[in-house]
Amino acid sequence: MQTFLPSANATISASMLDSKRLNKQILECYQILNVLSGKSKGGGWRNHPAVLMWKGYEKGLWKYVQAMIVEARSRGIRTENNEANLNNLKDLCWDIWGDNPPSFWNDKTKLMRVVTTHKASLFDKDPMFYARFGYAKHSIYNSPCCSKCKYYWVTHEGRNA
């Protein structure tokens, strides 16, 4: 589970993703919002870093997924089923969703670590498509939070590498 942020801007992030990952982002955003809204059956994923990084900022995740949908539609990717699920969840939960920025958003170093580790991971997933992100592999900001992770998860701060 992951919400890829190769840019601090959701619209730019959406435009940078390959179609496979772009479409997957829409589903994963629904799953994350579902967990954060307490609507998910069972307790799975509630402690996953991709869920925790958006806790309290569900409206920001909503904006992110809307950017993914707009980009997907522009590529001819069908999103109707996921959109229906998202809209139903929004209708039920909008008033309880938080609008605070994630903890990393206003910290330049943390934001650069998030963006850079996401670019490096995308490069690893598809080096041909993400060749323009190859530089991220050697960036000083490509420093995952711990030795077990590929990403910088703000939620893991304080763990030993």
Language-model segment annotations:
Residues 1-161:
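Expand to "…catalyze enediolate/carbanion chemistry for C-C bond making/breaking, isomerization
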